UniProtKB/Swiss-Prot annotation:
PANTHER family named among the record's database cross-references: GATA-TYPE DOMAIN-CONTAINING PROTEIN, KERATIN, TYPE II CYTOSKELETAL 3
Keywords of the record: Coiled coil, Intermediate filament, Keratin
Entry-linked Gene3D superfamilies: 1.20.5.170
Region (Disordered): 122-166
Limits of the IF rod domain: 1-41
Family recorded in the similarity comment: Belongs to the intermediate filament family.
One GO CC term on file: intermediate filament
Annotated spans, Coil 2B: 1-41
One Pfam family it belongs to: Filament
Anything else known: There are two types of cytoskeletal and microfibrillar keratin: I (acidic; 40-55 kDa) and II (neutral to basic; 56-70 kDa).
Biased composition, class Low complexity, residue ranges: 147-166
Designated name of the protein: Keratin, type II cytoskeletal 68 kDa, component IB
Length: 166
């Protein structure tokens, strides 16, 4: 009996950590897509931004501006509209995420305006940060995101050259 309970709790925990990492990736992807929109509108795009996701179960590499890939249990990351991401939620072109807060696509849109996310983390638009507390540690500042979880998953960004000054 106790062994079954422990196994179920471990599965639930691993599922929660997978969802947390997927949400971190989704947040980072949105941030990069929004930055790409802004630079495209202003006409001074930086060089290609790459996003790498490394976890104990799968690896997905992508570059901003239209990409698709599998991650974890059927999770897809995509720059285009109607791509799916985690547990049936979708993003791109103004769809909702995770059933609790909506995100708009297109230039100049942002996270937040007071909306909550994942129970323990909150967002503002622009360069403000957020923190999530489900056994991991993550932070967003400006254009970069670093994430760590007790499962050992991580999110890494690399940018091959600096943005030109305005």
């Amino acid at each position: 009996e106790a062994k079954d309970d422990l196994a179920r709790l471990l599965r639930d925990y691993q599922d929660a950590m997978n969802v947390k990492l997927a949400l971190d990736v989704e947040i980072a992807t949105y941030r990069k897509l929004l930055e790409g929109e802004e630079c495209r509108m202003s006409g001074e795009c930086p060089s290609a931004v790459s996003i790498s996701v490394v976890s104990s179960s799968s690896t997905t590499s992508a570059s901003a501006g239209g990409f698709g890939g599998g991650y974890g249990g059927g999770v897809g990351v995509g720059g285009g509209a109607r791509s799916g991401f985690g547990g049936g939620s979708g993003f791109g072109g103004g769809s909702g995420i995770s059933g609790s807060s909506g995100f708009g696509g297109g230039s100049g849109s942002g996270f937040g305006g007071g909306s909550g996310f994942s129970g323990s983390s909150g967002f503002g638009g622009g360069s403000s940060g957020f923190g999530s507390g489900s056994g991991g540690r993550s932070g967003v500042s400006g254009g970069g995101l670093s994430s760590g979880s007790s499962r050992g998953g991580s999110v890494r960004f690399s940018q091959s050259s600096q943005r030109t000054s305005r």
